[in-house]
Structures are given as structure tokens and as C-alpha cells.
């Protein structure tokens, strides 16, 4: 390379490094409520976190971050400031919607992370195209969906529904039914006092109950480990196409083989129905 060309290339690289710094701005709002909140949250990119705080108010903190496209930095900063000055927060009674930016162009090359503190009695609906979702300590119900990213829900007093196209799902300490689906990722649903319906195309499944209730588990590629409620009775149906089955002492009422088991645990009870295509089944 000629000296002049080398100088020009080095100068451009230096400008690129300096100019590619991210722009970050925030918006905040506190909404006072007389009663539980119903939240409807969405973000294209950035993720969502909801935690329980004291009653009577919802505290919203949004973080707007630019991408690293040098040639669009001025335009991106202008759009970030538009969102910052008019944050996407709507209220109708105790229903609060956050993240619904009606002019979709404003979010191009911008991520928006939502961090929200709510009264413990709240229910939550959350949607993310790219980014994880975490909900902790609310009454519920909780309904989460993400196209790319994991989902975590803990200490929920009622139903949890979690769906991820790509990402793991971790649910713990739920006092109600749990419904979980992921195309690619593992599933943990532990300490559940309600029914469980879990399915993954690629990944393992771990389930445990504190109260006997129906369990349905499906995994195309990955094993399943289930811990049943202590001293409770269940009806059991388990099958693996490639793997082995380990079950507690039970009364056989149908097939019993290394890859298929059907019978009653203790005196019988809610149905445990487990099928995996490739992997082991371990029921405790």
C-alpha cells in the first residue's frame, strides 16, 4: 500500500473506532395506583425485567441504546431523543402499556430495555423480539414470549405461561399451573404447586412439583428429569425412543420395558405423561 493510502486508511479506522461509540439515554416515570397493576410490555430489542416493590406505584425505567453504525449516528441520536422526550407509556385505569412505539421507524438500530418495579399484586404480559424477559415476585398471572432470548419467572403466586422461539426457560416457585414452550433451549420448572405442561424441540427438561397435579413433558432432543411431590400418588406413562427410563417403585398397569413404562406410583393420582425422542427419562 502507498504511504498516502496507508495514512488515509489509518485515519478512517481511527474515525470509525471513535465514531462507533454507542449513544445511551434513559426515560423514567412513576405512576401511582390505587390497587394492583396490569402491565402490558413490549420491546423489539433490549429485554424486559419486572420485579416487585412496595404497593401503590409502578416505577418505569427505560434504557435506549444505539447500534454502532457510524454513518447513521446523528439520525439515531435524534430518534433516541424523540423517544426520550415522549416515552412510550400509556395508562388506562390500572392497565399500563409500555414500549408500544407507534412509529416503528423510530426504533430502527435502537434497543430499548425496560426495567419496571410493580406492586406485588400485579399481573404481567411481556413480549420481546430479541432479548430476555425476567419477572419476579408478583401475583400474576404472568404471560411471556420472546423470539430470541431466555425467560425467567420466579416467586409467582398464580399461573405462568412462557414461550421462547430460541432460548432457555427457567421457572421456579410458582403457586399455579405452568405452561412452557421453546423451540431451542432447555426448560427448568421447579417447585411448582400446580400442573405443568412443558415442551422443547431441542434441550433437556427438569421439573419438580410441591403439590400433585398433572404433568405433560415432551422433548425431541434431550432427556427429562422429574421430581414428584413428596408422598403423593400419580398415574404414570413414560416413553423414550432412544434412551432408558428410571422410575420409582410403582404398580405396573401396562407396558414395562427399558423404554416404556405405564402404571401407578403409590395409590395413583394425576397423570404424568412424559415422552422424549432422544434421551433418558428419570422420575423420582
Question: What are these regions, as identified by a protein language model?
Answer:
Residues 5-16:
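Bacterial N-terminal signal peptides
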Residues 7, 223-224:
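General secondary-structure propensity
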Residues 18-42, 47-128, 134-146, 152-164, ...:
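Acidic (Asp/Glu) and glycine-rich low-complexity loops/linkers
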Residues 133, 205-207, 224-227, 283:
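Beta-strand-rich extracellular passenger or scaffold domains
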Residues 175-222:
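Eukaryotic tandem repeat interaction scaffolds
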Amino acid at each position: 500500500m502507498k504511504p498516502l493510502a496507508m495514512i488515509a486508511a489509518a485515519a478512517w479506522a481511527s474515525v470509525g473506532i471513535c465514531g462507533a461509540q454507542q449513544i445511551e439515554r434513559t426515560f423514567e416515570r412513576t405512576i401511582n395506583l390505587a390497587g394492583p397493576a396490569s402491565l402490558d410490555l413490549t420491546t423489539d430489542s433490549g429485554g424486559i425485567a419486572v420485579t416487585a416493590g412496595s404497593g401503590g406505584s409502578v416505577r418505569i425505567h427505560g434504557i435506549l441504546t444505539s447500534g454502532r453504525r457510524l454513518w447513521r449516528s446523528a439520525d439515531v441520536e435524534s430518534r433516541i431523543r424523540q423517544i426520550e422526550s415522549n416515552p412510550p407509556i400509556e395508562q388506562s385505569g390500572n392497565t399500563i402499556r409500555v414500549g408500544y412505539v407507534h412509529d416503528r421507524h423510530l426504533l430502527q438500530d435502537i434497543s430499548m430495555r425496560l426495567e419496571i418495579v410493580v406492586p406485588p399484586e400485579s399481573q404481567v404480559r411481556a413480549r420481546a423480539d430479541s432479548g430476555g424477559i425476567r419477572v419476579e415476585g408478583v401475583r400474576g398471572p404472568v404471560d411471556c414470549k420472546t423470539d430470541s432470548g431466555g425467560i425467567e419467572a420466579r416467586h409467582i403466586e398464580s399461573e405462568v405461561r412462557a414461550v421462547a422461539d430460541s432460548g432457555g426457560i427457567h421457572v421456579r416457585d410458582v403457586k399455579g399451573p405452568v405452561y412452557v414452550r421453546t423451540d431451542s433451549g432447555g426448560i427448568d420448572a421447579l417447585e411448582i404447586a400446580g400442573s405443568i405442561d412443558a415442551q422443547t424441540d431441542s434441550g433437556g427438561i427438569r421439573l419438580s412439583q410441591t403439590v400433585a397435579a398433572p404433568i405433560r413433558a415432551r422433548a425431541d432432543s434431550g432427556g427429562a428429569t422429574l421430581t414428584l411431590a413428596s408422598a403423593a400418588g400419580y398415574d404414570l406413562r413414560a416413553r423414550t425412543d432412544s434412551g432408558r427410563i428410571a422410575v420409582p417403585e410403582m404398580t405396573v398397569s401396562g407396558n414395562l420395558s427399558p423404554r416404556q413404562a405405564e402404571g401407578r406410583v403409590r395409590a395413583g393420582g394425576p397423570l404424568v405423561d412424559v415422552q422424549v425422542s432422544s434421551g433418558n427419562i428419570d422420575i423420582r
